[in-house]
Amino acid sequence: MSKIIELPEILANQIAAGEVIERPSSVVKELVENSIDAGASQITIEIEEAGLKSIQVTDNGEGIDHEDVPLALRRHATSKIKKQADLFRIRTLGFRGEAIPSIASVSRFTIETATEAGRHGTLLVAQGGEIEEHVPTSSPVGTKIKIEDLFFNTPARLKYMKSQQAELSHIVDVINRLSLAHPEVAFTLISDGREMTRTAGSGNLRQAIAGIYGLATAKKMVEISASDLDFEVSGYVSLPELTRANRNYITILINGRYIKNFLLNRAILDGYGSKLMVGRFPLAVINIQIDPYLADVNVHPTKQEVRISKERELMALISQAIATSLKEQDLIPDALENLAKSTVKRASKPEQTSLPLKENRLYYDKKQNDFFLKPQVAEQQLSFEESAKPVHEATDEKAEPQSTSVKFAERKPVSYDQLDHPELDQASLERAVDKLEQEEKSSFPELEYFGQMHGTYLFAQGKGGLYIIDQHAAQERVKYEYYREKIGDVDNSQQQLLVPYIFEFPADDMLRIKQRMELLEDAGIFLEEYGANQFILREHPIWFKEEEIEAGIYEMCDMLLLTKEVSIKKYRAELAIMMSCKRSIKANHSLDDYSARDLLFQLSQCDNPYNCPHGRPVLVNFTKSDMEKMFRRIQENHTSLRELGKY
């Protein structure tokens, strides 16, 4: 008797649903993407109990013909590709023909649809993938799909759903990403009768950003644009003063498809250079137009992982586009806004792991046919508070002498659990180290020094108003650029070690390091195999101080494992940051007038005078307008979304 059998269609669809439909947000994503592929300009999503009770997606797309509706529930039935060559030129969001049958197999499924050419609409009802009703009906052109009792026949999946608030947050995240990817589509998301998100569908990306993040955020987004023979990059990135604690506010789009790509995330951060604080991430919406032949989206059923040809060239293009746009901006933070943020008390809430789930403050004025921002009134009185903390000198600890003939290097364990990709870099490595890229000099205001406060802050005035300068951050930037140039040129001459070092690695890391050993050797680091899972180092480049060898070699190997490259410049940049921090003046240190003026002059000559190497602001600016607002001499005006489109 044959042991191998062909699985029934329903069971096969339920197995496929395990990959395609992970949670209610997966259903929303697949249905909305189908609506976009159908040419819809208006899409309404209505959910109950975070989608577990019901999900309804209504669009005004082209609809489905009566005879095609049952086929939509058959696995691998699709209208989007017809031959093998189409796989290499995919221009639609969906193409696998798995989503609808997978959804229908784990829910009570109802679809109403009509085409412009059809004499009537179609109603189809299915339960657990089995069609129960397929009849003509009267309905407008477009499609309405309703999913009820999701996972009713797969209780194991239902058991592991998170709280309704968490599942709702995932749905909002999906709609926000799709709204940014397709600003030409008007999206409306309604949860339990309450409107969560509404976008105008005007095609203006900045207006879509305002509809999701708010007007204040949209005003601080800088437009970017760049292209070459293969790629066209456009979108918006936030000014360095506007950051978040995680990468969840970075949206990368390829041909209108939201994707997750760690290397492109890194390219965005590289474009900021040292303008971002360590551990902080920008808001960004990067839209990449690419020949479909260069992007393989047939990697995973969710289609969020994309393999890109010429990825390094694309990374360089993105970084350059961001760096160029930021260079043209005034990067001195507005002091009044920073002051308001630090002194107006708000209820604390836990850090979110997705795009913010909150009630939109935009309201619609029917008379003016436009959106406006509801004003927020801060009742807390503003006050100046000293918030800077002194930077302490680091202390050097001398290691005890070794009695053995070789030194066994010790390292701190590196956790790969938090990495988005096991081969790629993480924030702790990528943020503080990429500082040796030459930055164009920006226009710096002419400042007239007139005083110091608490031995910490310098006061100066210029055409732009009052400037307050953090003297430690200012000198740190000056000294960093000095040390950067001083140690930037690398000599690969070798020096023998009297006592070799032994480095231990896990077996999988050993294999990957051996595969890429040439990159280490190009950097002047020659490791030899020495026993099981061990390398021995008998000589070192002369630019490596001996006290740096232990930590430095491990750091170079980590860089190799995570980023598939070894950059001496990045490693040396870390050293320049450390030296500049240690040797700069600290808080509570009074400067005479000559020293203060000289420091401001040296700062004005820096490539990037606005941030210290760690990304903290060097100076803030109170404009005349800011002062008048503080003393209630003028009132702020509210900006409409229509006016925002003029930016």
From Swiss-Prot:
Q: Where is the composition biased (Basic and acidic residues)?
A: 387-400
Q: Name one GO molecular function term.
A: ATP-dependent DNA damage sensor activity
What Gene3D superfamilies does the entry give? 3.30.230.10, Histidine kinase-like ATPase, C-terminal domain, MutL, C-terminal domain, dimerisation subdomain, MutL, C-terminal domain, regulatory subdomain
- Region called Disordered, residue ranges: 387-412
- Tree of life domain: Bacteria
Record Pfam families: DNA_mis_repair (PF01119), HATPase_c_3 (PF13589), MutL_C (PF08676)
Entry keyword annotation includes DNA damage = yes
Which terms are listed as keywords in the entry?
DNA damage, DNA repair
User: Cellular component per GO?
Assistant: mismatch repair complex
One GO BP = mismatch repair
Entry-linked SUPFAM superfamilies: ATPase domain of HSP90 chaperone/DNA topoisomerase II/histidine kinase, DNA mismatch repair protein MutL, Ribosomal protein S5 domain 2-like
Under PANTHER family, the record lists: DNA MISMATCH REPAIR PROTEIN MLH, PMS, MUTL, DNA MISMATCH REPAIR PROTEIN MLH1
Which protein family is it in? Belongs to the DNA mismatch repair MutL/HexB family.
Protein task: This protein is involved in the repair of mismatches in DNA. It is required for dam-dependent methyl-directed DNA mismatch repair. May act as a 'molecular matchmaker', a protein that promotes the formation of a stable complex between two or more DNA-binding proteins in an ATP-dependent manner without itself being part of a final effector complex.
**NCBIfam families for this protein:** mutl, PRK00095.1-3
List the HAMAP family.
DNA_mis_repair
Q: What is this protein called?
A: DNA mismatch repair protein MutL
Q: Which organism is it from?
A: Streptococcus sanguinis (strain SK36)
Q: What is the lineage of its organism?
A: Bacteria, Bacillati, Bacillota, Bacilli, Lactobacillales
